[in-house]
Every structure is written in C-alpha cells, then in structure tokens.
C-alpha cells in the first residue's frame, strides 16, 4: 500500500518539478528588462523631475509608452468626476519584472497608497513585478494604474483583460474614497478581506456579498457608512464575475494578507494551498 502511495507521490512531484523548471526557464529567457509609462502631458521640466524620482538616467534603456489624458478619462470617467481626473496626463510608472509578489513604491502620490495599488494590481492580473509610481508634484495617482498595466502588457506580451482592468480601476478609486472615512490602512485591509471572501466563497448574490462586507467590517472593528457599504458592494459584484485565482491573489498582495493573518483573521484555502497541505499530511503518514 505504502509503495503504491510513494509511486503516486513521486509522479506528482516529478510533474511539479518539470512545471517549475519550465517556469524558471521562461523567466530566464524573458530577462528583466524594465518598462516605463509616462504621462503624455508632462512638460520637459516635469518629465525631468519624474525621471529622477523613478531613478532613470537614460530613457533609451527602457521600453517607453505614453499614457494620454483621453485614455485616463476612458478608464476613469465612470468612477471619478472629470475635474478630479483633470485635463493633463501626469502619472508615470516604472515596472520591472521579478520580485516576490507585487512590490510598490510611490512618490508625490496623495490619494492612493502603496497597499491600494498592490491590491488593485493583483485584481488586474499583475504578477511578480516591482512598480514605482511618481508624479511631478502631488497628484492623486488614480490614473497610474492604467500606465502600470500598459507597461505590464509590454513586459509580458499578453493583453490584460479589460474586465479585470476596469474592476481594478474601480477598486483603486473606491478604496481611496472609503479611506477618507475609515483611514488608509483600514481601507486596504477591509478591501483585501472582502475580496478574498467573495472570491473564495464564490459569492455572487447581493445578499451574500452584503453579508461578507458586514462580516469583514465586524472582524476588523470598522464602522461603515451606508454610502461606503454601497460602493464596496457594487465593486464586489463586478469582482465576483472575474475569474480570479485566490492563491495568486494572496501571493501577489502577500504583505496585506500576512498582516491580516497576524491579526487573527483566518482565510479559506485555495487549490494549491490544499494540495501542499495534502502532500504534507501524506508525508507525515508515511514517516
């Protein structure tokens, strides 16, 4: 009996090793080239300021895209007033392949925190990347998500789902709005927790999502206004329609989820976590 189990385990481990080697080889072939998205309306002086903040000496060494104000309005008009978005594209982003999950740094960004970007970028589908967001002076930074994902598309050669990008933009805006009422860190944690529960439970109905929002707010000792609750509910309706991998989501925004776990929050296990735990249990049995 144990011999047969060992054969199954050996075969499974071989398959995992082959898959890991393939991914590793792909990462070597892909290299670690860096990509930049610049606001198309930056003046020369503003551009110099942004490049300095992004730690870029020679722009020719990078794959560069320019994000227009028209693109910013296309993605954000549904969630922000035109006056907030403005008439100039200024947000600029540098993206480097590699790292452990999504790592974010910001400069001159007043509305969006690093955690908010990390949460939203994970929703959009970004994986294992180092992201730096900068403005020439204090700006909201809400449009930077568009630039980050456009740079990510260039880096991976894969088109980002419009549905995921739309949900991520709404998530960034809603988290920022909720933060004005309950605080930045609290908003980051609440959004991450609600999203995890919605995705892991496969919640789709308004009633189920509202229950999750209330449950999560209670766990974090947060009191939500009716307006903020409605904003989150509308966003989660959209997120529930996306094909998000809960393991990947938690891996990419691990700083937030690790903090929640340290606070005593327990999460449902995703497929790969269950698989890992199954192997561990099996090895314990075979000892």
Q: Would you name each region that the model predicts?
A:
Residues 2-25, 279-282, 286:
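Sec-dependent N-terminal signal peptides of Gram-positive bacterial secreted proteins and lipoproteins
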Residues 122, 127-222:
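Soluble oligomerization/assembly scaffold segments of membrane-associated complexes
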Residues 46, 50, 113, 117, ...:
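Stable alpha-helical elements in mature extracytoplasmic
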């Amino acid at each position: 009996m144990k011999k047969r189990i060992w054969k199954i385990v050996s075969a499974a481990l071989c398959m995992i090793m082959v898959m890991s080697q393939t991914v590793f080889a792909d990462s070597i072939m892909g290299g670690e080239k860096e990509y930049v998205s610049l606001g198309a309306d930056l003046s020369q002086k503003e551009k110099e300021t942004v490049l300095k903040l992004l730690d870029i000496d020679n722009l020719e060494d990078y794959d560069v895209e320019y994000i227009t104000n028209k693109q910013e309005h296309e993605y954000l008009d549904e969630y922000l007033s035109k006056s907030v978005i403005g008439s100039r594209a200024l947000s600029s982003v540098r993206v480097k392949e590699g790292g452990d999950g999504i790592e974010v740094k910001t400069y001159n960004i007043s509305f969006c925190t690093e955690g908010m970007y990390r949460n939203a970028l994970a929703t959009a589908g970004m994986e294992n990347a180092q992201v730096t967001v900068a403005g020439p002076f204090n700006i909201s930074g809400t449009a930077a998500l568009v630039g980050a994902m456009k740079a990510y598309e260039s880096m991976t050669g894969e088109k980002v789902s419009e549905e995921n990008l739309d949900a991520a933009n709404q998530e960034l805006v809603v988290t920022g709005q909720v933060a004005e009422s309950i605080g930045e860190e609290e908003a980051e944690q609440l959004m991450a927790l609600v999203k995890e529960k919605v995705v892991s439970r496969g919640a789709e109905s308004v009633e189920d999502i509202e229950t999750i929002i209330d449950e999560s707010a209670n766990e974090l000792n947060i009191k939500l206004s009716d307006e903020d609750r409605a904003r989150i509910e509308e966003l989660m309706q959209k997120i529930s329609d996306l094909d998000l991998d809960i393991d990947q989501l938690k891996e990419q925004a691990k700083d937030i989820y690790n903090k929640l776990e340290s606070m005593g929050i327990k999460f449902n296990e995703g497929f790969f976590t269950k698989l890992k735990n199954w192997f561990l249990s099996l090895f314990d049995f075979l000892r």
